[in-house]
Amino acid sequence: CMGYFNPDSGKQDLSQAAMIIEGYEEIDARFVEKVYCHNHHLPAVVCETPRLLVREMSEADLPQMLALNEQNSTENAVEGKEKTLEEEIENFPSYRRYMYELCDMGYWAVIEKQSGKIIGRAGIEPKIWNQGRSVVELGYLIDAAYQRQGYGYEACHAILLEAKERGAKYLYCRIHSENKSSIALAKKLGFLKIDYHVEQDAKEIEVYRYVCGNDRVLQERG
């Protein structure tokens, strides 16, 4: 599954390896498990909190995710028209391969440990904004039945820590100006509103930025 590149070993044939490593400093059980899951197209665990498990989505999750998206108020939504279930299923292998296995990002399932139920989705995705600007954007959506219980903050707080571990410097989120609960969550996490507008967005969409090195905010609000 993994191959070790040894510069002193002469010619190596590592063509069958799913992952090539050059050292062992950052190799642990979690890393090996993720490589195994990606090589076998299985959902890998992203992070955990006392109440939640955040993991990559599987095709079996898509009907529930589509139902979750339908709860999102159209007038406060940021993204465009939602795809049908058939379209989501057709596109999922490409999404999994690009987002999860190549970019090591994506939207992930948020699962309540006690019940084992999916209660939302959250994650980070690479985006291209104005004039080809590359950013990493945080998105989150919690099932209406589980809102106002701190789940959104708990999941996103863990994801911010994970994003920093994966090398992110800044994270951004786009929020409709009337979505007061989402704005409050972003501010609680440490996001600050910036004077920036994404060209394809409606004028009501605001942009917030988070500095991943802001450990003090994470510690104080954890």
Which sequence ranges carry the predicted segments?
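Generic structural signal for hydrophobic
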Residues: 12-14, 163, 186
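Generic recognition of short, well-ordered alpha-helical segments
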Residues: 15, 133, 137, 151-154, ...
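Short acidic-hydrophobic, aromatic-tinged amphipathic segments that line or gate anion-handling sites
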Residues: 19-23
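GNAT-family acyltransferases
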Residues: 24-145, 157-172, 192-222
